[in-house]
């Protein structure tokens, strides 16, 4: 290490910064103690955001409330670590939303009752920091949450919460600002969000599929603190999955299923894509189809995990998901990384396998995630 320090001290500052910019966030977190120069670079806000904007996407997977797995989808290599103790019962995961390497964790108390407990947290898996968010009054199990930031100041992170269709109360919409550590109530109409589709945070704003007479993309602008109907969705049918493409576009993955006996059978995949979300008029166009037998189910089904996937630049899909196989009268859950293009499955790597006790419905979910050193806002 002493030799390494002497070498890097002799390098120009700009070159050291460029080398560190290409280093994974997990390694940078350890390198902060190497020397004062590195610490100064790594902890500067300008560097942290520059590093974040040039970092590749990963999959993050929570396995039955016990293990956090983070995978590089290009290599299939993944690391795992225990789920933080504070996210074990009674504060177990229900869902998450990603923004700038920060995970907004919506936790469950396994009831549909109002709760005044802090069941909402922001977590950075790299730095291991966690902040619990106390409710203004109470949270409800069917509330919708999103995380983003004011585009005039990226460090000004905010959380939006609005009531779902089972709240039985007047429509509630609240916004939490980390800078003031407080909630405010917003005056807004009721929104019926499509519950089968997760919301995504893109460029500081939240996007959901919402439903009135037809399904459309609903945006919450954290700068203006307003909702907006962005564009109409293509016919979704039973399922639809939103994601992020090239940092400023929304892909929509559609895949319906047939039932073969008691099992769900995957059918063809259609991927639609918006133009840039900053354009004056936003709309979906068909990006590509996948017509092939034996495709994996890229949606939540039965007691399997919610799969993680993202759309590549070459009309391809990378997906990390589960399937069941039967061997010697025993059922096993296989976790598999798929590379899929328009011709079908190009490559698949089994990354794990364990005994499956059917219908016990374990909690397992996957998300697209970018590791970062962005500090959890205080």
UniProtKB/Swiss-Prot annotation:
* Organism for this UniProt entry: Arabidopsis thaliana (Mouse-ear cress)
Q: Which PROSITE patterns match?
A: FBOX
User: InterPro entries attached here?
Assistant: F-box-assoc_dom_typ1 (IPR006527), F-box-assoc_interact_dom (IPR017451), F-box-like_dom_sf (IPR036047), F-box_dom (IPR001810), Gal_Oxase/kelch_b-propeller (IPR011043), SCF_F-box_component (IPR050796)
**For the F-box domain, which residue ranges apply?**
5-52
Q: Which residues form a coiled coil?
A: none
Q: What is this protein called?
A: Putative F-box only protein 15
Q: Which cysteines in this chain are paired by disulphide bridges?
A: none
Q: SUPFAM superfamilies of this UniProt entry?
A: F-box domain, Galactose oxidase, central domain
């Amino acid at each position: 290490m002493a030799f390494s320090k002497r070498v890097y001290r002799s390098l120009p500052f700009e070159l050291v910064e460029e080398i560190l910019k290409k280093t994974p966030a997990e390694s940078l977190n350890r390198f902060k103690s190497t020397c004062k120069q590195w610490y100064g670079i790594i902890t500067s806000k300008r560097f942290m955001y520059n590093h974040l904007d040039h970092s590749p996407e990963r999959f993050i997977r929570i396995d039955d409330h016990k293990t956090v797995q983070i995978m590089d989808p290009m290599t299939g290599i993944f690391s795992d670590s225990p789920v933080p103790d504070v996210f074990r019962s009674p504060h177990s995961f229900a869902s998450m939303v990603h923004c700038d390497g920060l995970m907004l964790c919506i936790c469950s108390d396994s009831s549909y009752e109002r709760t005044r407990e802090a069941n909402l947290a922001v977590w950075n898996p790299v730095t291991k920091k966690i902040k619990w968010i106390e409710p203004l009054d109470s949270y409800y199990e069917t509330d919708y949450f999103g995380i983003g930031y004011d585009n005039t100041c990226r460090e000004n992170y905010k959380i939006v919460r609005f009531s779902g269709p089972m709240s039985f109360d007047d429509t509630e919409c609240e916004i939490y600002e980390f800078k003031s550590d407080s909630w405010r109530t917003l005056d807004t109409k009721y929104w019926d969000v499509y519950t089968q589709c997760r919301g995504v945070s893109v460029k500081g704003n939240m996007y959901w599929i919402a439903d009135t007479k037809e399904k459309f993309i609903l945006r919450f602008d954290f700068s203006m603190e307003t909702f907006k109907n962005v564009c109409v969705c293509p016919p979704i049918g039973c399922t639809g999955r939103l994601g992020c493409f090239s940092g400023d576009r929304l892909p929509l993955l559609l895949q319906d299923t047939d039932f073969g006996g008691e099992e769900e059978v995957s059918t063809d995949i259609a991927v639609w894509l918006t133009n840039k979300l900053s354009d004056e008029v936003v709309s979906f166009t068909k990006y590509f189809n996948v017509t092939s037998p034996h495709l994996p189910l890229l949606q939540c089904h039965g007691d399997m995990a919610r799969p993680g996937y993202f759309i590549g630049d070459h009309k391809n899909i990378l997906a990390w998901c589960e399937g069941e196989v039967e061997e010697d009268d025993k059922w096993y859950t296989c976790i598999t990384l798929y590379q899929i293009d328009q011709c079908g499955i190009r490559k698949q790597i089994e990354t794990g396998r364990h005994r499956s006790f059917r219908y016990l419905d374990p909690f397992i979910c996957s998300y697209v995630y970018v590791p970062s050193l962005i500090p959890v806002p205080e």
